[in-house]
Structure formats: C-alpha cells, structure tokens
Amino acid sequence: MSRIDGRTPEQLRPVTIERGWSKHAEGSVLISFGDTKVFCTASVTEGVPRWRKGSGEGWVTAEYSMLPRSTNTRGDREAVRGKIGGRTHEISRLIGRSLRAVIDCKALGENTIVLDCDVLQADGGTRTAAITGAYVALADAVAWAQGKKIVKAGRKPLTDTVAAISVGIVDGTPLLDLCYEEDVRAETDMNVVCTGDGRFVEVQGTAEGAPFDRKELGALLDLATAGCVDLAALQRDALVRTQDA
C-alpha cells in the first residue's frame, strides 16, 4: 500500500525530541511526530495533594490542551467556553496514567510533578506524541529535583521508559503512526502505550468502520510494540545528549 507521505506500513513519521525549550520549567521538550508538534513541560512542586499527605509518596499528573489554531480551523479556547471538554479530560488522564506506570512514587517522596502538554500543531497522534515527549520532560524534572536534593538519592524514581504510538487499519492494511488523513479514513483506530521492556500500559482500540478480528488485533499490536521500541531508543538518545548540543 502506498501511504500519503510515501512511508511503508511499519514506518514511523520523522520524530524529533528537543529538550530545554523553556528556561522556566524543570523539564521541557518540543516533540514532533511528522507535522504533529507538542510542547511538554514538567513542573516540580514540593508537597502533594491533600489526600496524599502523610503517605510518604509523591504524585505525577498531567494536563493536555490544544492551541486554538493547531488544526485546520480555529477552535475557541476551552477557558473561554468555560468548560473543559470530555476529550481533553480523557487525554489528560491517559497521559498521567502512562507516566505513573514508570514512576516509583515512594522514591519521589512527597513531591508533585505536573506535566503540561500543549499541542502546537496537530496532524494525528497528538496524545501519543504527548506521552512520548512528556516522559523525556519528566526525566529531566526528576534529575533536576535530585540535583536540588528535593528528591533524595538512593532509589530511582523512574523505573522504565514509556512511549505511545497510534496504529490502524486503512483500506485493509495495518499501518503504524497514522497522520490525520489516514486517521479519518481508518476502519480501525488504536492507541497503544508501552513501557521500555515491552509491557502494555494502555490499549485503546475502536472499530470505526468495520469490526476487526483477532489476527488483525495481533498485527496492530505487533506494529505498535515495534514502534514503541524505536521511540524508546529515541527517548534514550535525547536524554544522553546535552541540551545545548
């Protein structure tokens, strides 16, 4: 099958991870999955939510949003509408769950890290790009907190990497990392979150046009796990590069 951008079915879009985009945030990343661009910041706060106090454990949470003109037509800011949409809540929770899957909250101590993921430009896969970029921002924030002695030395707060990718069936063919034009045509659409050692954190799959069978599900999961392996390697490469390189 010939894809819109010339990729093979199992090929990621060009992925770039640029650290240190904000001089204020303890961790910050601009991540690009092709034309999808998401700005992720990680902010460290000493203390935890009231319901977490006295537990000795930290907390990691996330917020997701899209800039008004991140898509083909402008959308009002949700703050102007006076209500956060269901999709925004869902994706924010997904990002938070994904990151907490690889955090040892006990090692974090009673500290909170908030990830803000803002979509600058959308061309499919914004939530998967957000998760992948947010992990790198989180890693930088954890390193900053350890350097400042806010997080105690000893146990490692990060237990693994985590990344996410979209897969889908378009015109009967399983594809990795769908752009927007592929996403809207997909008979099946799925988002998969994996840890660096290949375990699944979340699998969100929907038959948009036609039901999918067990064989197709297996093919999609195989594509997704291979894609997440590649993304984990890119995350590791980004984290070993100096920010001014």
Curated annotation (Swiss-Prot):
Phosphate binds at residues 87, 125-127. Pfam families: RNase_PH, RNase_PH_C. One of its GO terms (biological process) is rRNA catabolic process. Signal peptide: none annotated. It comes from the Bacteria. It catalyses: tRNA(n+1) + phosphate = tRNA(n) + a ribonucleoside 5'-diphosphate. Keywords: Nucleotidyltransferase, RNA-binding, rRNA processing, Transferase, tRNA processing, tRNA-binding. Its EC number is 2.7.7.56. GO terms for molecular function: 3'-5'-RNA exonuclease activity; tRNA binding; tRNA nucleotidyltransferase activity. PANTHER family: EXOSOME COMPLEX COMPONENT (PTHR11953), EXOSOME COMPLEX COMPONENT RRP41 (PTHR11953:SF0). Belongs to the RNase PH family. NCBIfam families: RNasePH (TIGR01966). Phosphorolytic 3'-5' exoribonuclease that plays an important role in tRNA 3'-end maturation. Removes nucleotide residues following the 3'-CCA terminus of tRNAs; can also add nucleotides to the ends of RNA molecules by using nucleoside diphosphates as substrates, but this may not be physiologically important. Probably plays a role in initiation of 16S rRNA degradation (leading to ribosome degradation) during starvation. Homohexameric ring arranged as a trimer of dimers. This is Ribonuclease PH.
